[in-house]
């Protein structure tokens, strides 16, 4: 009892401190002498994102165009279309990512690709001219694809290319594009029995073309013939034009990729012995000038075109009207 009383009295006894010795700290003492250091994270600013992060996010979206889900691919294409970049160098990667989707099995994905391609061409003028080699390769492949749905939507992409880069198509891919129309419409270029049976076999193996799809194909064929066989008329504007010296073009960089093609140094552009182009010689011909394209149509394609278009006119309806319009273009070409 006396021991406990002594321990309680110790709590009220004032300790005698020696000189220079600090007071003992209690057991529950918390040290507050430290100073916090600030942490700076400039790349994680909420107010404004850095351009590098934006570009990384955009490239990540482009990688999702290869996603296994068609719904994801469609939504990614919509997102890219709604926020196209201002940096022109990124459009090459956009085309490299979306053009393989021309062969996509989903119709909704192909429609989004067409919409995005149209928007890219409108945003960056000259984009399709610059990348015409890779773009037209996928379009021609789609026009001869084994799946009917992909063939049916292929001319939508060709229509976009013709709207923005018809001159590039006419100069470098006139013959291949025109032959692709014969493939997609199951037309025959020759009248011999062997070619006719081959055309019938090919048509049955790849499946027939629906009436709605044929209307679209003929409409694009009409645009193709008009844009490649006739000179474009200059649009009249009210903006004053400054006079340019007529010799200026001789000192400027050429606008076409083959400025010396007219000299026929590396191509065979001369007709055969009978002064007629043949189907076998089309692959080695250059179609840079308008007269060569017109002569190719006159010598090789005009007769089978008229024959097949006349058969479609007899069907009537929208197909007949579009076919008649194409025949009108051939008549204009014949009279010019």
Curated annotation (Swiss-Prot):
Predominant subcellular localization, coarse grouping: nucleus
A matching Pfam family: Ipi1_N
Keywords annotated in UniProt: Nucleus, Ribosome biogenesis, rRNA processing
GO biological process: maturation of LSU-rRNA from tricistronic rRNA transcript (SSU-rRNA, 5.8S rRNA, LSU-rRNA); pre-replicative complex assembly involved in nuclear cell cycle DNA replication; regulation of DNA-templated DNA replication initiation; ribosomal large subunit assembly
Compartments, record wording: Nucleus
GO cellular component: cytosol; nucleoplasm; rixosome complex
Ranges where the record places region Disordered: 1-36
Statement: the UniProt record of this protein carries the keyword Cytoplasm: no
Gene Ontology molecular function, alphabetical: chromatin binding
InterPro entries assigned: ARM-like (IPR011989), ARM-type_fold (IPR016024), Ipi1_N (IPR024679)
Subunit details: Component of the RIX1 complex, composed of IPI1, RIX1/IPI2 and IPI3 in a 1:2:2 stoichiometry. The complex interacts (via RIX1) with MDN1 (via its hexameric AAA ATPase ring) and the pre-60S ribosome particles.
Function summary: Component of the RIX1 complex required for processing of ITS2 sequences from 35S pre-rRNA.
Family according to the record: Belongs to the IPI1/TEX10 family.
Protein's recorded name: Pre-rRNA-processing protein IPI1
Organism (species): Meyerozyma guilliermondii (strain ATCC 6260 / CBS 566 / DSM 6381 / JCM 1539 / NBRC 10279 / NRRL Y-324) (Yeast)
Species lineage: Eukaryota, Fungi, Dikarya, Ascomycota, Saccharomycotina
């Amino acid at each position: 009892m006396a021991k406990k009383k002594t321990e309680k009295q110790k709590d009220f006894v004032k300790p005698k401190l020696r000189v220079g010795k600090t007071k003992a700290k209690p057991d529950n003492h918390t040290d507050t002498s430290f100073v916090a250091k600030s942490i700076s994270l400039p790349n994680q600013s909420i107010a404004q994102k850095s351009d590098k992060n934006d570009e990384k996010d955009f490239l990540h979206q482009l990688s999702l165009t290869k996603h296994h889900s068609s719904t994801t691919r469609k939504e990614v294409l919509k997102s890219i279309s709604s926020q196209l970049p201002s940096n022109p160098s990124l459009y090459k990667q956009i085309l490299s990512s979306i053009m393989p989707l021309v062969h996509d099995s989903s119709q909704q994905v192909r429609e989004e690709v067409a919409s995005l391609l149209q928007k890219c061409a409108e945003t960056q003028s000259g984009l399709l001219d610059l990348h015409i080699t890779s773009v037209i390769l996928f379009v021609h492949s789609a026009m001869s694809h084994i799946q009917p749905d992909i063939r049916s939507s292929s001319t939508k992409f060709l229509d976009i290319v013709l709207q923005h880069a018809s001159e590039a198509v006419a100069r470098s891919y006139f013959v291949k594009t025109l032959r692709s129309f014969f493939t997609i419409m199951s037309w025959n270029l020759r009248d011999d029995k062997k070619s006719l049976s081959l055309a019938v076999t090919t048509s049955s193996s790849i499946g027939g073309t629906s009436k709605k799809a044929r209307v679209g194909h003929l409409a694009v064929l009409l645009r193709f013939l008009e844009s490649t066989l006739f000179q474009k008329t200059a649009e009249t504007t009210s903006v004053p034009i400054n006079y340019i010296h007529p010799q200026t073009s001789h000192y400027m960089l050429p606008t076409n990729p083959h400025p010396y093609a007219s000299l026929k140094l590396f191509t065979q552009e001369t007709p055969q012995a009978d002064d007629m182009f043949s189907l076998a010689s089309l692959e080695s011909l250059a179609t840079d000038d308008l007269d060569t394209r017109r002569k190719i149509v006159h010598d090789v394609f005009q007769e089978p075109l008229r024959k097949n278009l006349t058969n479609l006119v007899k069907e009537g309806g929208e197909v007949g009207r579009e076919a008649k319009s194409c025949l009108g273009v051939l008549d204009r070409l014949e009279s010019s």
